[in-house]
Every structure is written in C-alpha cells, then in structure tokens.
C-alpha cells in the first residue's frame, strides 16, 4: 500500500514537472498592468495622495504620468525625483520603482469632481504596457483661503541621480569655468582684479591673501548660484512645454546664436550703461576687507564679459530644461568656482603662474563655441531621430577636428606633428556617417525589413484573415513607446533567417501608439496585456495560443520559434 502511495505521489510530481516542458516558449510570464502597478488613492479634505505599488522587476515612467482635474482646482503637482534608466532607443529616462507616492493639494472640488490619472510602465525583461488611465472621484471641498502646494515626497527605493539628466555632469561646469578663465576677455583681468581684492597692498600673509581671494570667489559664486536656482525654478514650472518640438527647435537656434558669438560673429554682453553702474558700485567697496571683497565678487558675477555671456547663457538655458533646483544651483556654483581658481592662484603666488597672453586665448574661446554647438545637436536629436542625429554629430565632429587641425598647422614644435596626425585621423573618422549618407556604403546599407500590412480594428483583422487564402498569418503589435518593439524591428525582423522562415506567412501589424478606443478594443479582443506581443494564426484563421510571443526575442531564438510552431 505504501509503495502505491509513493508511486502515485511520484507520478503527480513528474506530471507537474514535465508539464513545463510542453509550455510554449512565447507564453506570457508578465502580469496584467493592474498587478504590475497597483494604483490607490486617499483623500483627506484638501490633501490627496496618489500611490503606486510597483512590482519587482517593473517600473513606471516619470514623464508618462499626467494628472488632469475635472470640476476641480488643484495646485501644481510636483512629481518626486526618480532613478535613471537608459536604453538604446530613448536614451535616459526617469523612472520609479517599488513605491511611488504623489501628494496633490485640492484647492477646490465641486460635486462630481474627478481626477484623470494616466501612467505607463514597462518590465525589465523588455515588455511595455499601454498607457493606463484611472479616474479618481474627489470629495466635495470648498475653496481654502490659503491653498499652497504640498511639496512632493521622495520615492522610496533606489537613490535618485538627478545629475544624470544632463549630457554633461555638473563636474563639467567646473572644467568649463576653468577654461573660460583662459579666454582673452578674462585672463588679462586677473592681475588687476587681484590688486583690487588685496586693496593695493603688496605685503600680506599668504593665508590672508588666500582668504580674501576665496571670499571674492564666494561672492561671485553666490550670484551665479542664485541665477541657477531662479532659472531652474522657472524651468520647473514650464518643464513640459520645454519638451515641445517647437520649443526645442527655438532653444537649438538660441544655442547656435550663442556659439556664433563665441566665434566672433557678434558681441553679446550687458548694455554698457548697466555695466558702468555695476562697476561704480564695485569701486565704492573697500578692497582688502572681507565684507567689501565679498560684495565686489557678488557684483562681478553680474558683469558678464563677451567671452562669458554665451557659455553662461547656454548653461542657464540648459538648466531651465532640467527643472532641478539643486542641480541648477550646484552647476553654477562649480562654474563660478572654476573661474575663480586662477584668480586665487594669482592672488597668492603672483602673475608668474599665469601663461603669457597670445592668440591661443582666442582659440580657447572658439573651442568653447564648438562645445556650445553640441547642445543644439543634443536637443534636435530628440526630434529628427537617430539617423539624422548621427549625421549632425558627424558634421560637428568634422568641423571641430578640421578647425583644430588647421589651427595646429601654425605650431612650430615637433611634437605638434603627432597631434596633427591624431586630429586628422579624428576628422576622417567623424566624416564616415556623412560619407555613407551621401555616397552609400555596402556595409552601411540598411537591412531589408519585413513588409507588413497595417490593420487597426478587429474587423480589419478578420478581413485580413479571410483574405489570407489558406496561408498562416503573423500579427505584430507595435508602438513608438515600446523599446522592445524597436529592438524587434532592428535586430530580429531584419535577420535573413527570420525573413526566410516567414516567407509563406501573411504579415500584419497593428500600430497602437495612440492607444485610442479602437486600439484598446483590439488589444482587449485579443487579450494582449502589453507590448511587444506577436500572434500567430493557422491557415484556417485560428490563433495558435502556444505560439504567442511576449517580450523580446533575438533573431536566433525567434527563428527557432518560427520553425517549432510549424504544424
């Protein structure tokens, strides 16, 4: 008897274990959106809290969260800082993991008032959900006398990394500040400024001279930090507008004009009357005293020379896009500190540490013009796409390395020949994308892609299945916001093995980027949780559930899957 019971248990375990061998490789291991991102809300009079419990291995996109009131007035919602996630197609995006709490201040809500909350997320395994929309009913709330927005709480979980939002870290601001110090408008002024800071006294202890120079630099840094905070705060209010294509194009034009001013095409500075007033205010301060030196530094931060106006404006405009006040203030502080380091050295050690003035200072100014030109390319790349973005980077690289090579020809030193060879090689490498675009290249030819027939509704799908004429059908769901869909397109569908395996298959594709009513109806009808999802139908128009693919597959795996699904 005991042996029979043992045998029965063994058979049951074996059945459970071997059942997994017959599972389809494409069967979804992903949970529905409501389980991946558990949404909840709680209202206490004017205070409303929206919360998401994010399942392990999933994340929400910060920029995809929108909150729209109906019959209600709410304070400006400030989403907490997230963590940074990077992929090949969309670059860096701010995301939330584990748990997200968003406080909302309800200034006034009439009877029947609601909030429409839209959000979207993905799985780390390469599976994205369509945007989810929830309607939050609001309790009736009378208008408060003094309704102020509640500051957003921080996300629990991973540590945010706001500095990663910029293509250059805040440390670059320090290096840019040091570089600006060696432009022709700034470097010759350091000995004069040093004398003013010391109050005309030549015999001061090293410690006293260093202290006065440091105080002057801190005064200058205070002005720049305040500018950074103000601009970042203003950018925070208009952050969504700053991502609009027209605004990005406008910013790109402004950055280009700033770069042209660094090339000497025109001069950009404060009006002379305002500069004169600031200079007179600075001259009234007493040099050699900590208080007077600090005020002189603060005023000096407002007097922008032609060499510093363009880089400062570029940094301020870029900070406005981040909307991060800590990053804005810190970046401008490091920028001012970089400009002040040479001044501190001159004040303590004298002019002997400064390099001699010469044409090289104009070259430094021009080089910063090329640095500023990188910002328009970075902004336009979001609009024009990866291919054209690469061509713009190529054009900028050719221009910079070509200019540097021509400039280096004036040098007489032998070791500069090595530098010239490196610059020439860099220019030749940079020109390759432009060469492939203009003349074509066998190695650079875009791979052939599958020729899909577009469908958008259930009726169109049924009609396409009826017209398949006894052939198997593959239906691919695609959306612009689906990273893995783009990976399928670039790496899998372009593979010759995949194209050969699909030679006798009718190819359909549903683009659900808009996520409108007919898209939602199609997804619901076919029980599609998210993207990428690929469905297969047999010659009779019946879906083969075991062949369904959810999540990304590389070319080899997908090709094997296509062969395995064949009857």
Swiss-Prot record:
Enzyme class, first EC level, given as a word: oxidoreductase
GO biological process, one term: cytochrome complex assembly
EC number: 1.8.1.8
Disulfide bonds: 122-128, 185-307, 482-485
Membrane topology term: Multi-pass membrane protein
A Pfam family assignment: Thioredoxin_7
Entry protein name: Thiol:disulfide interchange protein DsbD
Gene: dsbD
